[in-house]
UniProtKB/Swiss-Prot annotation:
GO molecular-function term, one example from the UniProt record: structural constituent of ribosome
Subunit structure: Part of the 50S ribosomal subunit. Contacts protein L29, and trigger factor when it is bound to the ribosome.
UniProt protein name: Large ribosomal subunit protein uL23
An example Gene Ontology CC term for this record: ribonucleoprotein complex
Length: 97
Protein backbone atom coordinates (compact mmCIF):
# COMPACT_ATOMS: atom_id res chain seq x y z
CA UNK A 1 0.00 0.00 0.00
CA UNK A 2 1.30 3.44 -0.86
CA UNK A 3 1.86 6.15 1.69
CA UNK A 4 -0.53 9.10 1.46
CA UNK A 5 2.43 11.51 1.55
CA UNK A 6 3.41 10.34 -1.94
CA UNK A 7 0.25 11.96 -3.31
CA UNK A 8 1.32 15.29 -1.76
CA UNK A 9 4.74 15.18 -3.44
CA UNK A 10 3.56 14.77 -7.05
CA UNK A 11 1.13 17.53 -8.00
CA UNK A 12 0.48 16.83 -11.69
CA UNK A 13 2.15 15.68 -14.90
CA UNK A 14 3.66 18.47 -16.97
CA UNK A 15 2.47 18.04 -20.55
CA UNK A 16 4.40 20.45 -22.75
CA UNK A 17 6.24 20.29 -26.04
CA UNK A 18 9.54 19.77 -24.24
CA UNK A 19 8.15 17.02 -22.00
CA UNK A 20 6.90 15.07 -25.02
CA UNK A 21 10.34 15.37 -26.61
CA UNK A 22 12.17 14.05 -23.53
CA UNK A 23 9.71 11.15 -23.28
CA UNK A 24 11.58 9.62 -26.22
CA UNK A 25 14.68 9.44 -23.97
CA UNK A 26 12.77 7.45 -21.32
CA UNK A 27 12.04 10.52 -19.17
CA UNK A 28 8.83 11.99 -17.74
CA UNK A 29 8.16 15.45 -16.28
CA UNK A 30 6.01 16.16 -13.21
CA UNK A 31 5.06 19.31 -11.33
CA UNK A 32 6.00 18.58 -7.72
CA UNK A 33 5.56 20.22 -4.32
CA UNK A 34 7.83 23.20 -3.72
CA UNK A 35 9.46 21.65 -0.63
CA UNK A 36 9.94 18.15 -2.06
CA UNK A 37 13.48 16.77 -2.19
CA UNK A 38 14.92 14.47 -4.85
CA UNK A 39 14.80 11.34 -2.64
CA UNK A 40 11.16 12.07 -1.76
CA UNK A 41 10.28 12.52 -5.44
CA UNK A 42 12.07 9.28 -6.37
CA UNK A 43 10.29 7.32 -3.63
CA UNK A 44 6.89 8.75 -4.62
CA UNK A 45 7.27 7.90 -8.32
CA UNK A 46 8.51 4.38 -7.57
CA UNK A 47 5.66 3.74 -5.11
CA UNK A 48 2.82 5.25 -7.14
CA UNK A 49 3.74 3.98 -10.60
CA UNK A 50 5.72 0.82 -9.78
CA UNK A 51 8.75 1.73 -11.91
CA UNK A 52 12.51 1.95 -11.29
CA UNK A 53 13.88 5.52 -11.27
CA UNK A 54 17.53 6.02 -12.23
CA UNK A 55 17.79 9.83 -11.89
CA UNK A 56 15.81 12.87 -10.72
CA UNK A 57 16.58 16.39 -11.95
CA UNK A 58 14.64 19.35 -10.54
CA UNK A 59 14.14 22.95 -11.55
CA UNK A 60 12.10 25.90 -10.27
CA UNK A 61 10.30 27.97 -12.89
CA UNK A 62 9.91 31.46 -11.47
CA UNK A 63 6.43 32.98 -11.60
CA UNK A 64 5.88 35.72 -14.15
CA UNK A 65 4.75 39.25 -13.36
CA UNK A 66 1.27 39.78 -14.78
CA UNK A 67 -1.19 42.66 -14.83
CA UNK A 68 -4.91 42.20 -14.20
CA UNK A 69 -7.25 45.18 -14.51
CA UNK A 70 -4.34 47.55 -14.05
CA UNK A 71 -2.96 45.90 -10.93
CA UNK A 72 0.37 44.11 -10.94
CA UNK A 73 0.47 40.56 -9.64
CA UNK A 74 2.81 37.61 -9.65
CA UNK A 75 2.15 34.01 -10.62
CA UNK A 76 3.36 31.28 -8.29
CA UNK A 77 6.72 29.58 -8.73
CA UNK A 78 6.47 26.00 -10.02
CA UNK A 79 8.90 23.21 -9.19
CA UNK A 80 9.32 20.57 -11.90
CA UNK A 81 11.02 17.19 -11.72
CA UNK A 82 12.47 15.44 -14.76
CA UNK A 83 12.44 11.72 -13.93
CA UNK A 84 14.71 9.30 -15.83
CA UNK A 85 13.33 5.76 -15.84
CA UNK A 86 15.21 2.48 -16.15
CA UNK A 87 15.47 0.86 -19.58
CA UNK A 88 12.26 -0.74 -20.78
CA UNK A 89 10.02 1.02 -18.25
CA UNK A 90 7.45 3.72 -18.99
CA UNK A 91 4.68 5.77 -17.38
CA UNK A 92 1.46 6.70 -19.15
CA UNK A 93 0.82 10.24 -17.86
CA UNK A 94 -2.49 10.59 -19.70
CA UNK A 95 -4.17 8.36 -17.10
CA UNK A 96 -4.75 9.61 -13.56
CA UNK A 97 -3.17 8.32 -10.37
Amino acid sequence: MTDLRHYDVIVSPSITEKSTLVSEQNQVVFNVAKGASKPEIKAAVEALFGVKVTAVNTLVRKGKLKRFRGFAGKQKDVKKAIITLAEGQSIDVSTGL
